[in-house]
């Protein structure tokens, strides 16, 4: 195995890593958008719910019933967290971190875009 | 008389309630596992760029050799006094195997994400099972993992290993003569002692339900299939094998 072939192999290896992380971006962007929209809905809903003078007079469940917008967006937000949205919004960095864990064994690392970092072979003591 | 009957009734009720409670806990534990697995970011198959597709057509399809015990699964049999898994953890399946004319029950726990892992890597590699356990047990486990998907057809067992200094060494040339396109995934460094440049080490797994070692490997395995010689990457191994 000559060094030219090895370099070629490492390049192809790196290409797939960067390509994969790049491909993840649109989906991650959509998840982030969704999280922002639902969070903003929940926040506005909560504000309206809290400033409503009725909320303090009636029971908790009745007040929730009076503010369906808040109730629904809050349930959606909880559902999203159960489905792991907090991990999906950082998926590319999770994948990059996994790469780093495995590549460390091979004296390499990678940045958040998947670019390889080759480390010099340590001297045997 | 009345008192004894009352006590007896109460005792039956308590016993029944305890059974119901443990059943409930059992169900809950299963559900928690499902939720954890679902929450984790997995590894979706994403399309190849034209350059990568072209590259893939130029290189050979690789073989991935997989170990079973403590890599893909963990099992203990009913004779063990202190099982390594937390008591009460339900096994994924139970195997009944006859060894030396004695029927033995093996409680097998699948490593988290193993089904997903096998499904994904089977699209990239030709999978081969190579285990140091006995054929009768190894083939039953492989059948269960395969789940009639026909992805684990080639299998090698203890009789295909070479015994050296009390440990079983897996000779990859038995599986395939061309070492440029074969990779072995094993938790024990001793198993691939004769082919260190073809090895991917993995931490031994016993019971941790939040383990993601198999998912961690997916980006690396995805990228590795584009190399002409897997040793270009794998020979950079420092072999700082910790005793896992």
Curated annotation (Swiss-Prot), chain A:
The chain crosses the membrane at residues 33-53, 65-85. The keyword Mitochondrion does not apply. One of its GO terms (biological process) is positive regulation of triglyceride biosynthetic process. One of its GO terms (cellular component) is cytoplasm. It is a multi-pass membrane protein. Its main location: nucleus. It comes from the Eukaryota. Keywords: Acetylation, Cytoplasm, Lipid metabolism, Membrane, Nucleus, Transmembrane, Transmembrane helix. One of its GO terms (molecular function) is protein phosphatase regulator activity. It is found in: Nucleus membrane; Cytoplasm. The modification N-acetylmethionine is found at residue 1. It holds the Pfam family Tmemb_18A. Muscle specific with lower expression in other metabolic tissues. InterPro entries: NEP1-R1. Interacts with CTDNEP1; the complex dephosphorylates LPIN1 and LPIN2. Forms with the serine/threonine protein phosphatase CTDNEP1 an active complex which dephosphorylates and may activate LPIN1 and LPIN2. LPIN1 and LPIN2 are phosphatidate phosphatases that catalyze the conversion of phosphatidic acid to diacylglycerol and control the metabolism of fatty acids at different levels. May indirectly modulate the lipid composition of nuclear and/or endoplasmic reticulum membranes and be required for proper nuclear membrane morphology and/or dynamics. May also indirectly regulate the production of lipid droplets and triacylglycerol. Belongs to the CNEP1R1 family. This is Nuclear envelope phosphatase-regulatory subunit 1. It comes from Homo sapiens.
Swiss-Prot record, chain B:
It is an enzyme of class 3 (hydrolase). InterPro entries: Dullard_phosphatase, FCP1_dom, HAD-like_sf, HAD_sf, TIM50. Residues 57-224 form the FCP1 homology domain. Gene3D superfamilies: HAD superfamily/HAD-like. It catalyses: O-phospho-L-seryl-[protein] + H2O = L-seryl-[protein] + phosphate; O-phospho-L-threonyl-[protein] + H2O = L-threonyl-[protein] + phosphate. GO terms for cellular component: cytoplasm; endoplasmic reticulum membrane; lipid droplet; Nem1-Spo7 phosphatase complex; nuclear envelope; nuclear membrane. Its EC number is 3.1.3.16. It is found in: Endoplasmic reticulum membrane; Nucleus membrane. Coiled coil: none annotated. CDD domains: HAD_FCP1-like. The chain crosses the membrane at residues 7-29. It comes from the Eukaryota. Pfam families: NIF. PROSITE patterns: FCP1 (PS50969). It is a single-pass membrane protein. SMART domains: CPDc (SM00577). GO terms for molecular function: phosphoprotein phosphatase activity; protein serine/threonine phosphatase activity. Its main location: endoplasmic reticulum. Keywords: Endoplasmic reticulum, Hydrolase, Membrane, Nucleus, Protein phosphatase, Transmembrane, Transmembrane helix. Serine/threonine protein phosphatase forming with CNEP1R1 an active phosphatase complex that dephosphorylates and may activate LPIN1 and LPIN2. LPIN1 and LPIN2 are phosphatidate phosphatases that catalyze the conversion of phosphatidic acid to diacylglycerol and control the metabolism of fatty acids at different levels. May indirectly modulate the lipid composition of nuclear and/or endoplasmic reticulum membranes and be required for proper nuclear membrane morphology and/or dynamics. May also indirectly regulate the production of lipid droplets and triacylglycerol. Interacts with CNEP1R1; the complex dephosphorylates LPIN1 and LPIN2. PANTHER family: DULLARD PROTEIN PHOSPHATASE (PTHR12210). Belongs to the dullard family. This is CTD nuclear envelope phosphatase 1. The lineage of its organism: Eukaryota, Metazoa, Chordata, Craniata, Vertebrata.
